């Protein structure tokens, strides 16, 4: 069985978990402490970061983008797309994942001014996504895709941020 290594509430792991769940791939998850990473984890993770996915063949994969692409290649894709559409989907997914850490930084802001500046930058990213969505619920219209899965961690945290300022 596939094994996913994580720490609690990691947006990069949430993206991988979303892909696993959407594809109905059974997996187990093992949580580690971010501030006290075990040596076995440091031995298998080239960058010492999560997520790490260990395949059925004991191959260790790292970096969420690479893991999600592996899952799409290994298991039935959520959808069949042209090479051009696949590149567009990746680009929109990268737009999401590059904002994971800035969003976490926004949530950890120490003062109101820093929070508001960081929030304004995040809002720009969401406005671009909303423009792409148009009147549809999902990036591809009426069904969830890999792009939507990439945006899930941001949307989850946006809800948390909104709840804290309202």
Residue ranges and their predicted role:
Residues 1-139, 143:
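GST-like domain detector, emphasizing the conserved glutathione-binding G-site
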Residues 141-165:
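GST superfamily/GST-like fold recognition
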């Amino acid at each position: 069985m596939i094994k996913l290594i994580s720490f609690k509430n990691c947006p990069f792991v949430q993206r991988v978990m979303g892909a696993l769940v959407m594809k109905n791939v059974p997996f187990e998850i093992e949580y580690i402490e971010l501030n006290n990473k075990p040596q076995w984890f440091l031995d298998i993770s080239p960058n010492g970061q999560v997520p790490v996915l260990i395949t059925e063949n004991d191959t260790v994969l790292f970096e969420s983008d690479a893991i999600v692409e592996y899952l799409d290649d290994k298991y039935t894709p959520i959808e069949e797309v042209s090479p051009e559409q696949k590149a567009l989907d990746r680009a929109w997914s990268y737009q999401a994942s590059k904002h994971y850490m800035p969003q976490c930084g926004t949530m950890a802001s120490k003062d109101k001014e820093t929070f508001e500046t960081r929030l304004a930058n995040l809002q720009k990213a969401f406005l671009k996504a909303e423009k792409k969505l148009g009147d549809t619920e999902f990036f591809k219209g009426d069904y969830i895709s890999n792009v939507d899965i990439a945006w899930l961690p941001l949307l989850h945290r946006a809800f948390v941020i909104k709840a804290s300022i309202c």
